[in-house]
Curated annotation (Swiss-Prot):
Its EC number is 6.3.3.3. Belongs to the dethiobiotin synthetase family. The gene is bioD. SUPFAM superfamilies: P-loop containing nucleoside triphosphate hydrolases (SSF52540). It comes from Neisseria meningitidis serogroup C / serotype 2a (strain ATCC 700532 / DSM 15464 / FAM18). The keyword Electron transport does not apply. CDD domains: DTBS. GO terms for biological process: biotin biosynthetic process. Its cofactor is Mg(2+). It is an enzyme of class 6 (ligase). This is ATP-dependent dethiobiotin synthetase BioD.
Amino acid sequence: MKGVYFVSGIDTDIGKTVATGMLAKQLLQQGKSVITQKPVQTGCQDIAEDIAVHRKIMGIPMQEADKRRLTMPEIFSYPASPHLAARLDGRALDLDKIRTATQELAAQYEIVLVEGAGGLMVPLTEKLLTIDYIQQQAYPVILVTSGRLGSINHTLLSFAALKQYGIRLHSLVFNHIHDSRDAHIAQYSLSYLKCRLKADFSEAEWMELAKTDAV
């Protein structure tokens, strides 16, 4: 594993932040040089909350790249999708700033995990969706799903979108965070999605994130 990977989810509140932090922690334990980035953080004033969570999970302090805002190049105060948060804050989202920050991180670290906002179809600007940006940058995707009701539908829709855009799926992360809602649905969702991943993206990895890993 080397390069820049985009971490997305099938929906909001699916556990992308914890999944990103846990994956970064595992890579650190393997001796890899890894950093996480939250290119657009909404609902914050100064420090990207998701980056703080990543560092806590990774067991490391805020890094020099964090202090230089390379890991959090765009922060908006209103908790909404990036395009709406930018509009309400009265300024445009700077895609060049984000690209430059990611490139600088990639030059310093072996692996960069870029955590997106929401799912693949979340608008970054009025004209650009998150999936458009991923396609432009040719980033492989790490997709986070779970076993809650509706996850199969949302996961398969995400699969279809990735295929339509010609984007490589690196891995599907099954987050057990919602298992307690309905154990039957969670277990069936796991087995079904595991089979579908093998059929639809045969080279992609299957990963699982235990609920006890959450912070």
